[in-house]
Amino acid sequence: MKCLAVCQDELVIRTLHQVLVPGFEVEFLVESRPLARKLHDAGLQVSLGDPRRVDTYLKADVSPNTLVLVQDNGRRSLRRIVDAAKDAGGALVYILSTTASTRRVEELRAHTPE
């Protein structure tokens, strides 16, 4: 099964890579060009793009069978990222919260109950 992980922290990316690679075909979507280059040099499959844009997910070949993991680090608009992933055809979207606050996740659940 294919997995697209939208992450911006290197520690989270490396941890997910170690955990998911045995069972999934994992690709990471990052916004930072230096981070993408560093991860690519380390042998990880990385794409560079804006996670708030639908065309980014279309380029990553997101389908209804693609698992999309979105890191909530509290810095970006989570709703726009999730909406873009769903508009591109993603049906399996999960939020990985790396902040202490659950307020953002609750707001997203109110907007998108499924």
State the predicted function of each range.
Residues 1-114:
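Cytosolic regulatory regions of ion transport systems
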